[in-house]
Amino acid sequence: MATHGISQVTTHGRRCAVAADDPVAAAKIAAPDVPVWAVQRPRITKLIAEDVRWCQLTVVTSPPGAGKTTALALWAAADPGIVAWVCLDEFGNRPGVFWSYVVAALRESGVTLPRALAAAMRGRVGGHMFLLQLAAALAAQDPPVTLILDDLHLLTAPKVLDGLDYVLRNVGSGLRLVASSRTDSLLPVHRYRLAGELAEIRASDLAFSTAEAGLLLAWHGSTLTAGQLECLTRRTEGWAAGLHLAAVSLDAHPDPDQLLRSLPRKAAR
């Protein structure tokens, strides 16, 4: 991927910069590393791929540790096309910060943005002219780009959310938005649901099946009987973090049955 140096924008008289050679900034616009213990889950990868193909907005909602980010990273690594990734934090509630990272992520993914957008960025980032220019640029994108916003629940500022909704409603087929969140999104998802443009992936979809749990434990070198594996999957309800913690514990536990009996429901989720 190309390196684009520093992208600077002005917001309320202050400069916001995204530097490609800044490791902190670079981490914000890069897909996180997939954990070494993560197992391939074709069922989930296919589900995400189909949702992104047919819907403009895909929201992956589940509690911590359910595997949202890992599932999206595995899908993104499967070469689904042009993918831009933004790891959100509380600072994203400042329009200048949020849109700086979005633009940097789009450029890093290979999307060419017109000079008119650069001119708009010298104005008030997040203002109408900037959003209009960004939406117009993305509407012309062919093939479409998928923008992943990880940890969307951290975005609570109405101005940022309204701007994101505006762009999404005016890009046609040029943009697909995929968001992971611990809570239901503050975006007006009902509008996309009514239009048939919303796909929702929940904790129940991300839950490991018994077979998938077996693959995870096999990676750790743990061997359970079919009954023990079913018990573990049932007690953790397929919760990814719980299964991982149980697998680590099994490595050092001499009696799997005793460990399984002591395991609380949902592994203390």
Report residues per predicted region.
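Conserved adenine-nucleotide phosphate-binding loops and their immediately adjacent elements
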Residues: 12-48, 115-119, 215
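Loop-to-helix "switch" segment enriched in basic
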Residues: 20-21, 138, 183, 193-194, ...
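Hydrophobic anchor at the beta1->P-loop junction of P-loop NTPases
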Residues: 60
